[in-house]
A protein has these predicted regions:
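C-terminal accessory helical subdomains adjacent to catalytic cores in phosphodiester-
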Residues: 1-13, 27-59, 73-238
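Catalytic nucleophile-elbow at a beta strand-turn-alpha helix junction centered on a G-D-S/GDSL motif
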Residues: 18-28
Length: 238
């Protein structure tokens, strides 16, 4: 009698990754950029936006934004309970900027000065809420638009006639000032998205960022964004 053939080891099992996102921008990023770079033949990505409110009478569901942790927790648990096999995972993509105070680890991490250690504290706290090896918590430093600062030249190609030389110089100066673009802070008027909007008046938070990133080398984004790269590396190793 011949040796039993292990089809599982011979066939590349496609991994399913549910990504709980803050809003439409992140969903578009997953569908249009992240999936392409991870590989359509290796992964099936399922981005899901946080449900913020539901009007049962009107039959409407409202999505996007993170006002409190309870809504996030509800959606994460819903997906976790739906996982039926070991080839399915769940991760998150929330901006550090604007996280609610009741988010796990937020209060405890405020005394930590090193931003990477602070984010690690928050992610660990989020992970401990579920104690599931298939759950990979990720918080974006400081917000989604940080990724756009990885290549201002690509941004110029998309918005070349919508920002003057002074505006472009301000963006270049921002990179020089911080050196590490993941450190561009989360102030009300100084977060990455606010800096972009100040220089590019037509910048739209939902659509413009995706336009710019589609023209940017994904490898360059990973090189410029240490924490983001660590997340991608984790997903690639599944």
């Amino acid at each position: 009698m011949g040796k039993e053939y292990n089809w599982r080891s011979a066939v590349n099992i496609m991994k399913t990754i549910h990504i709980i996102c803050e809003g439409k921008t992140e969903v578009d990023f997953v569908n249009k950029i992240l999936w392409d770079n991870l590989g359509y033949d290796k992964y099936r990505l399922e981005p899901k936006t946080i449900i913020t409110n539901a009007d049962k009478k009107a039959g409407k569901i409202y999505k996007g934004g993170v006002s409190n942790f309870a809504k996030i927790d509800r959606d994460i648990k819903r997906v976790l309970h739906s996982i039926k096999n070991t080839d399915t995972y769940i991760t998150t993509m929330f901006d550090y900027y604007g996280l609610p105070d009741d988010f796990p680890g937020m209060v405890q991490s405020k005394s930590i000065t090193d931003i990477y250690q602070r984010i690690e504290k928050i992610e660990d706290a989020l992970g401990s809420c579920y104690k599931c090896s298939q759950f990979i918590p990720y918080i974006q430093l400081h917000e989604f638009e940080t990724l756009i600062f990885s290549d201002i030249e690509s941004l110029k190609k998309v918005f070349f006639d919508e920002c003057d030389s002074i505006g472009w110089q301000l963006l270049y100066d921002t990179i020089k000032t911080f050196k590490n673009i993941e450190l561009i802070n989360n102030g009300v008027n100084s977060s990455p998205s606010k800096r972009l909007k100040q220089c590019i008046k037509s910048y739209d938070k939902v659509y413009s960022g995706i336009q710019a990133l589609q023209s940017t080398d994904f490898k360059l984004i990973r090189q410029q964004c240490r924490h983001f790269n660590e997340w991608i590396t984790q997903l690639e190793s599944l």
